Amino acid sequence: MANKFLMALVLVLIFPVFAFAKDSPEWVANLNVAQETGQLAIVRGIKGSDAEFSFHVKDFDGKWSEIISCPAFIGKKGWGKTREGDMKTPKGVFHFTMAFGIKDFYGCKIGYTKVDDTNYWVGDSNSEYYNQFVSTSYYDDFNKKDSEHVIDYNPGYQYCLNISYNEDGVPRLGSAIFLHCYTKNKFTGGCVAIPEDKMAEVLENVRDDCIIIMDTDKNIRNY
């Protein structure tokens, strides 16, 4: 009996029981990327800057469950980012590289950085740190007008996850593409925005192996 209880406890700790979980749609389980990971974040474009965000987890038996679902906003000019400042959201398969934000947050499995006044996301294409998170305490040689002073982006950057678009920092290809909280606008500059409470839920659950796919409703099933 004790062994059975211990095994059940271990399973709960590894795969928590989600109060609002439901079976993921069949097409999610059939995605090629679903064979490569145990977590999927999906941004499915609806129309214009309107989208739907969902978060899915796979259990020991290979069954997928949807644990988060909510409306989302993408770039003001829709999909297909190709350059810095084009107000478009990139399409494709990505991962999350870091979690950070203005608010405190505890328990994020991939780590979490609470930002301070020294933190910028570098948008200066001439900088060796283009599309990277920096502190001016250690690096100050970049154009701050072209970069994002993270702590100023309230309420959007209360909680953030960096999406791995242009991870190699190719100049002028685009920077600072995040999953972040809603702002007063019903669009973004190229990021994906969801309600703050849902963003907190994502931070509670996201793991290193999480894959995020982003595209139109027409194309999202091709991944």
Stretches found by the model and what they are:
Residues 8-16:
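Bacterial N-terminal signal peptides
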Residues 22-189, 198-223:
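Cell wall/extracellular polymer interaction/catalysis modules
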Residues 2, 16-25:
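Bacterial Sec-dependent signal peptides at the C-terminal "C-region" and cleavage site
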Residues 1-7:
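Bacterial N-terminal signal peptides that target proteins for export
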Residues 192:
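Residues that recognize and position ribonucleotide moieties
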Residues 195:
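Conserved "landmark" site that anchors the functional core of diverse proteins
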